[in-house]
Amino acid sequence: MGSPEDAGKAPAYRVDHLLSAVESELQAGSEKGDPTERELRVALEDGELWLRFKELTNEMIVTKNGRRMFPVLKVSVSGLDPNAMYSFLLDFVAADGHRWKYVNGEWVPGGKPEPQAPSCVYIHPDSPNFGAHWMKAPVSFSKVKLTNKLNGGGQIMLNSLHKYEPRIHIVRVGGPQRMITSHSFPETQFTAVTAYQNEEITALKIKYNPFAKAFLDAKERNDHKDMMEEAGDNQQSGYSQLGSWLIPGAGALCPPANPHSQFGAPLSLSPAHSCERYSPLRNHRSAPYPNPYTHRNNSPTAYTDNSSACLPMLQSHDNWSSLGVPTHTTMLPMSHSTGTATSSSQYPNLWSVSNSTITPAPQSSGMSNGLSSQFLRGSPVHYTALPHPVTATTSTSPLYDGGAPADLPDSQYDASAHTRLASMWTPITPPSM
C-alpha cells in the first residue's frame, strides 16, 4: 500500500519519444530547404514517360463523373522554408487557340475554341503543410479528376477536343499570403477527349498504367469470348436430317443416363466421343432411333444437305460391326435406285408416299448391307435416303399404332395387328433417274 502522498501524485508519463517523432517529421526534407526561398526549384517526375506521350499527342479522358489523369502529375520540390506553411494548387490553361479534331490518324485544327470554362482550381489534399513536408517526397496530384460537366466537388472542368497545359502553384500561408511560384511543363500538354482517338496512346496507357490492367483483362476476355462464339457458330448445334428422322448434333448425341422409357436406346458412338457409358453395340443391343422423338417433323419441310457440318462424328459403315436385328413384319426393307448408292450426295432422292397396301418382305440384307431401310408412315412427307445403317429395336414407342410392349418375346407378337395396318403402308417406288 502506498502512502496517501503517493496516491495524490499524478503518474509521470514519458513524452520524449513523442517529441522525438515530431522533430524527426519536421526535419524530414529540411536538408532541401532554404529559409530565404531563393533556391526554390520544382522538377517534373517521370519526364521521359511524359515525353513519350507528347510525341504521340497525349490525350486525357474527361467524363461526366470525372476521370483521373495518367500519367500522374508529380513534382519534386526543393528550396522551401522547412518551417513555413505552404499550399499546393493545380489548374489548367488552354495551350493554344484551336479546337482540334482527329482525322486520318492525326490531330488537325477543327475550328474556333469554345468559351473557357469557369476557372477551376484543385487544392492538394495535404494543404496547408510545412515546407519540410512538401520537400521530403514528390508531390503527387493523383486524385485530381477531369470532367466535362460543371459539377463542382473539386473536379476540373475541361472542354473536349481542346488542348490544355497543367500549372502548379505554391502559395505561402500562415502570414501575409503571397504567391511564391507557378510552374508548368510543356511535355504535360494533352488534348481532352471523351474517348481515346489514337490507338498508340491507348496502348501506352495500358502498358504503363497499373490500374489499366483490368481494362486489358476485360478486353482479352471479350476477345476470347468472341472466338468461342465464332467457333460455336461453325458447329451445327441443331438437328441434322437422316431420312425422315432428326439426329441431334454432336452436343446432343450423349443423352442423360436415364432416358425416358418410351424412347429407344440412343445412337451409339465410339468411345472417342467421350460417351463411355454408352459403349457401341453393347450386348448386341440394336440402336433404333435417336432420342428426341419430339423433333420428328411431319410437315413438308425441305432440309439442306449439310452433311459435312452436321455429321462429322458418325463412323462409316465399314467400321460398324454387323448387328443382330430380329426379323419382324414391322421392319420392311426398302429398295432404292443405284444412283442413290453411288451418288456423292448423302441425300440425293426424295420419295413421296401415298396411302396404299404393301407386301411384307423377309429381312435378309436390308440392314447390314449398303443403305438401310426406313419406316415410312402414311404421310405426305418427303423422305430422304439414309446414308448409313441404322438399326431398329424391338421396343416400340406409344407414338406408333399397334406397337408391341418391349418385354414381349417374338412369339407373342400379334401378326394380325400388322395385317390390320396394311392399309396404312404404301409401296415405295424410287423415281426414275
Swiss-Prot record:
GO function terms (MF aspect): DNA-binding transcription factor activity, RNA polymerase II-specific; protein-folding chaperone binding; RNA polymerase II cis-regulatory region sequence-specific DNA binding
What GO cellular component entries does it have?
A: chromatin; nucleus
Disulphide connectivity of cysteines: none
Alphabetized UniProt keyword annotations: Activator, Developmental protein, DNA-binding, Nucleus, Transcription, Transcription regulation
SUPFAM superfamilies in the record: p53-like transcription factors
Triggers of expression: By FGF-4 and activin.
Q: According to the UniProt record, which residues make up the DNA-binding region?
A: 49-217
Q: Where in the cell is it found?
A: Nucleus
Give the matching InterPro entries: p53-like_TF_DNA-bd_sf, T-box_DNA-bd, T-box_sf, TF_Brachyury, TF_T-box, TF_T-box_CS
Please give the biological process terms from Gene Ontology that the record holds. Answer: cell fate specification; heart morphogenesis; mesoderm formation; positive regulation of DNA-templated transcription; regulation of transcription by RNA polymerase II; somitogenesis
What does the protein in this record do? Involved in the transcriptional regulation of genes required for mesoderm formation and differentiation. Binds to a palindromic site (called T site) and activates gene transcription when bound to such a site.
Assembly and oligomerization? Monomer. Binds DNA as a monomer.
Recorded protein name is T-box transcription factor T
Q: What is the species listed in this Swiss-Prot or TrEMBL entry?
A: Gallus gallus
This protein's encoding gene: TBXT
